[in-house]
C-alpha cells in the first residue's frame, strides 16, 4: 500500500451520489485564463468569471478531487456544480462567507 492510496472495488464509481447539483453558464470576461480547483467554493471564484453567483453559493465544481477547470479569456461554458457537504460552513477563499451557509 502507498501512503494516501485508496483501494476500491472494480467497476465504475459515482462521485457525489445523492447530492444536489445545478448547471451554470460561466463566461471569463477577463484577459487572463482562470483555473478553478475541485473544492473551491464557486460563489467566491475570480471576479472575472461572470455567472449567477447567488445560485453558486454553497456549491463547488462537480469534478474529481484534485482536478480543475480552466476558463480561457472570452470563453463561455456550462459547468455542473455540486452542493458542499459536511458542516456546510465556508472559511477563507475570498472571505465572502466566513461561517455557516
Curated annotation (Swiss-Prot):
CDD domains: Urease_beta. Its EC number is 3.5.1.5. Disulfide bonds: none annotated. Coiled coil: none annotated. It is found in: Cytoplasm. One of its GO terms (cellular component) is urease complex. GO terms for molecular function: urease activity. InterPro entries: Urease_beta-like (IPR002019), Urease_betasu_sf (IPR036461), Urease_subunit (IPR050069). The keyword Nuclease does not apply. Keywords: Cytoplasm, Hydrolase. It comes from the Bacteria. Transmembrane segments: none annotated. Belongs to the urease beta subunit family. NCBIfam families: PRK13203.1 (NF009682), urease_beta (TIGR00192). Heterotrimer of UreA (gamma), UreB (beta) and UreC (alpha) subunits. Three heterotrimers associate to form the active enzyme. This is Urease subunit beta.
Amino acid at each position: 500500500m502507498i501512503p494516501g492510496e485508496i483501494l476500491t472495488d472494480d467497476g465504475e464509481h459515482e462521485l457525489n451520489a445523492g447530492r444536489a447539483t445545478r448547471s451554470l453558464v460561466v463566461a471569463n470576461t477577463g484577459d487572463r485564463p482562470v483555473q478553478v480547483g475541485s473544492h473551491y467554493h464557486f460563489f467566491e471564484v475570480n471576479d472575472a468569471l461572470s455567472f449567477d453567483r447567488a445560485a453558486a453559493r454553497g456549491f463547488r465544481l462537480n469534478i474529481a478531487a484534485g482536478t480543475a477547470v480552466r476558463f480561457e479569456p472570452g470563453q463561455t461554458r456550462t459547468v455542473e456544480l455540486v452542493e458542499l457537504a459536511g458542516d456546510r460552513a465556508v472559511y477563507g477563499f475570498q472571505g465572502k462567507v466566513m461561517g455557516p451557509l
